[in-house]
Regions:
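Divalent metal-binding pocket/active-site signature
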Residues: 89-91, 102-185
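N-terminal hydrophobic targeting/anchoring segments and the immediately downstream early-domain regions
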Residues: 1-127, 181-239, 243-250
């Protein structure tokens, strides 16, 4: 069975956007519910999403497993999977990994651009890799069922996460650095190791990740997709649009 999945969206959520996703035939979307929020603030985001689910239950529902993607396709709805762009909601307490999973989190980045308690972000000058605490958190994420996302992480930290995780990881929204040398984009070394480990890459439409930014040409993007598939294989490459509808340009 084939599914249409967007591996990352970050929008100012409304019924209009959910309708657009349905018109696009998306069976599932991974949404950012946390950037830098702590645990209590994450719970507030959950309450906000509960209201969205209740008001738009003909279009969306909370996704928690692969089976929910099949369910969404059959019911002509979109399954919404919660993800964190940072590890801030678990604070410095490994027990919160299971707690956030219970409230629907299914993806968590180990860091967002900068150094965290778990790993090094892509904007740091020195990449010390996954920390000791990060190693323990990876084990716990594997245990409870949260996908490790290294989209905003530095090279060595990303390679460490691939090696340390007993389950495939994801880079949900980034592009290859061979196409555009943004700090957020990933090297061929990472792409190959990600694919070999069973992980997946979601290609991004975000301007800062694109060659020529907002002037990026469709042909150029498609050529990049084809070359990435040559490196990783067609089953390891998806889309992580980083759609930011109704958000300010800044």
């Amino acid at each position: 069975m084939n599914y249409r999945i967007d591996n990352l969206q970050y929008c100012n959520w409304s019924r209009e956007i959910f309708e657009i996703n349905r018109e696009a035939g998306l069976d599932a979307i991974h949404v950012t519910v946390v950037y830098h929020e702590d645990y209590d603030e994450f719970l507030n985001r959950v309450k906000e999403w509960d209201e969205l689910f209740n008001k738009n239950n003909d279009l969306i529902f909370l996704g928690k497993s692969y089976e929910d993607i099949t369910k969404a396709q059959k019911e002509n709805k979109t399954a919404v999977f919660f993800g964190f762009q940072n590890c801030s909601p678990i604070e410095d307490d490994i027990n919160l990994v299971e707690k956030v999973h219970q409230f629907g989190c299914r993806f968590m980045q180990l860091t967002y651009n900068n150094q965290s308690l778990l790993a090094t972000g892509c904007y740091e000058k020195n990449d010390s890799g996954v920390t000791n605490f990060g190693r323990e958190v990876i084990k716990e994420m594997n245990r409870v069922g949260i996908v490790i996302d290294m989209s905003h992480s530095a090279e060595q930290s990303t390679l460490d996460a691939i090696d340390l995780s007993e389950k495939p990881i994801a880079i949900t929204h980034a592009n290859p650095s061979f196409w555009h040398e943004a700090k957020r984009n990933k090297s061929n070394t990472v792409l190959k190791k990600l694919a070999e480990s069973g992980g997946i890459l979601g290609l991004s439409l975000y301007a800062h990740h694109l060659k020529d930014s907002t002037n990026c040409k469709l042909d150029s993007f498609c050529e990049m997709v084809a070359r990435t598939v040559d490196i990783m294989g067609s089953k390891k490459v998806g889309k992580g649009s980083y759609l930011c509808q109704n958000k300010p340009d800044s």
